[in-house]
């Protein structure tokens, strides 16, 4: 353990960066399963780390470098790991991912003081007040679908800047070429490969390192092009959800795109950049022509920097006044709200019509109904159905589960400007709960509710928890009036699973 801690010292790591010998440390695999460097990802401890020894790791790595073993193919055995592919690949890949994270963790530790100084409320809802204050002045949004590298060598070259150990990079090449389809790393939920299901740390590390590389290039080019420093904000949740905003965001690739310097460089332009669910979103108060130039710039950037044939169809230019932005489970837009003001001057009166921009957040009811249908609470049309898998639970547990789901929905979408759609969700969950209870007692829904009363389920779906929020009502205001307002909570640290629709 002391030897591993020695590799975490900045002075020693900067001198040689030799991470490959750590693969032969048995305790490194126990750390990979128990806690990790930052305890960011929790893995289920299945007890197979007890089966690991120095001889197993040495034998597996030796097999990787045996050319004759690669040429031997069997339909029942893996090329490298043999019949215990699921076990050995998980051991080595998680251990390798844990070790190769050391340079990044050192960077995180060195910059920890700067991160603590940032104003981070550690709440997803803290983002929306910022959007309300700033997005009302913006006009267009670039919705960019982040491309994935088609060639595996791009991933290796990305890590080459941080990991100087050639042996570790060679081992990474063997891992990637053994599972040659990179889609199993970037889409683990959709893949049926067992490797994609058991290598979450490896998947997150590859994806985050790739995204961190291209965003660091943007930040570097921005600081080189303008004297005005950008203001950054970061919140890191479980290492896979990252949000950042940059004011006056202008980046010019002066080396390869000198001709675009006069087109994009504008110190007075206010722009905001953030990344969410595999997308990069760039919002600006500029014109459509300027956003088209940014579209052209991004295409050339990906092609020249990462050798990616990036199509313009992967970038959507939307006007906030007429289109909604899918962000953090909300459909956000800035519609023009007409407002008429009557002015009286002596005997003359005037009617002044003004169009006011207002940040609007809407609950995406159709995708949420699709998520409820996928979770077997209703059909695709939104008609409630029973939940047979919960029929074996007690009545109180069934009601509490349905009520807990609805309360989570209500709390997360409390900032919506139109809450009428929440009653549709309440209707689906309430009737699904009644159907589940009636199925358990082998009765009809009507007979079950008549025996217990119509208010039996109402109290479980209307009782709200007292949670500190951004809205502090007056003593004279009623509870009903409070919930008509938009409320942003301090304790929302993750999106509801049913709200995080695919």
Swiss-Prot record:
Gene: matK
PANTHER family in the cross-refs: MATURASE K
Protein source organism: Ipomoea purpurea (Common morning glory)
Name used for this protein in its record: Maturase K
Gene Ontology cellular component annotations, sorted alphabetically: chloroplast
Similarity comment: family membership: Belongs to the intron maturase 2 family. MatK subfamily.
Purpose of the protein: Usually encoded in the trnK tRNA gene intron. Probably assists in splicing its own and other chloroplast group II introns.
Gene Ontology biological process terms in this record: mRNA processing; RNA splicing; tRNA processing
Subcellular location, record wording: Plastid, Chloroplast
GO molecular function, one term: RNA binding
Top-level taxon of origin: Eukaryota
Primary site of residence: plastid
Span of the signal peptide: none
Keywords linked to the UniProt accession: Chloroplast, mRNA processing, Plastid, RNA-binding, tRNA processing
């Amino acid at each position: 353990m002391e030897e591993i801690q020695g590799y975490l010292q900045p002075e020693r790591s900067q001198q040689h960066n030799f991470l490959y010998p750590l693969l032969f440390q048995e305790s490194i695999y126990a750390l990979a399963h128990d806690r990790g460097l930052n305890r960011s990802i929790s893995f289920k401890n299945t007890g197979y780390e007890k089966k690991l020894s120095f001889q197993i790791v040495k034998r597996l790595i030796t097999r990787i470098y045996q050319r004759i073993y690669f040429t031997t193919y069997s339909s029942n055995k893996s090329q490298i790991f043999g019949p215990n592919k699921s076990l050995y690949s998980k051991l080595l890949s998680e251990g390798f991912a844990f070790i190769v994270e050391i340079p990044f963790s050192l960077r995180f530790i060195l910059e920890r003081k700067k991160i603590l100084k940032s104003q981070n409320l550690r709440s997803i809802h803290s983002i929306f007040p910022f959007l309300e204050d700033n997005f009302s002045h913006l006009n267009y949004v670039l919705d960019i679908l982040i491309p994935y590298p088609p060639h595996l060598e791009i991933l290796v070259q990305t890590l080459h800047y941080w990991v100087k150990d050639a042996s570790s990079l060679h081992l990474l090449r063997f891992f990637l070429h053994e599972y040659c389809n990179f889609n199993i790393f970037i889409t683990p939920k959709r893949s049926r490969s067992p490797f994609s299901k058991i290598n979450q740390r490896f998947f997150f590390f590859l994806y985050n390192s790739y995204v961190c590389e291209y965003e660091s290039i943007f930040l570097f080019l921005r600081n080189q092009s303008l004297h005005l420093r950008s203001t950054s904000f970061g919140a890191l949740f479980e290492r896979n959800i990252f949000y950042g905003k940059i004011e006056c965001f202008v980046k010019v690739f002066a080396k390869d795109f000198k001709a675009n310097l006069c087109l994009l460089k504008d110190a007075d332009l206010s722009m905001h950049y953030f990344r969410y669910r595999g997308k990069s979103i760039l919002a600006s108060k500029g014109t459509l022509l300027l956003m088209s130039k940014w579209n052209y710039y991004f295409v050339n950037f990906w092609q020249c920097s990462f050798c990616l044939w990036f199509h313009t169809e992967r970038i959507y230019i939307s006007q906030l006044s007429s289109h909604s932005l899918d962000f953090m489970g909300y459909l956000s837009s800035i519609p023009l709200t007409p407002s008429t003001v009557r002015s009286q001057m002596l005997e003359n009166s005037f009617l002044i019509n003004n169009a006011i921009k207002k940040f609007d957040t809407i609950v995406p009811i159709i995708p949420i109904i699709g998520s409820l249908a996928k979770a077997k609470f209703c059909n695709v049309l939104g008609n409630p159905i029973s939940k047979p898998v919960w029929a074996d639970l007690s009545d109180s547990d069934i009601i509490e589960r349905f009520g807990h789901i609805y309360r989570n929905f209500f709390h997360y979408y409390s900032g919506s400007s139109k809450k009428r759609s929440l009653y549709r969700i309440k209707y689906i969950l309430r009737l699904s709960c009644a159907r589940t209870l009636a199925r358990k007692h082998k009765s009809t829904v009507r007979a079950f509710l008549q025996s217990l009363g119509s208010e039996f389920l109402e109290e479980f779906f209307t009782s709200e928890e007292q949670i500190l929020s951004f809205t502090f009502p007056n003593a004279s205001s009623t509870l009903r009036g409070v919930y008509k307002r938009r409320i942003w909570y301090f304790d929302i640290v993750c999106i509801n699973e049913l709200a995080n629709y695919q």
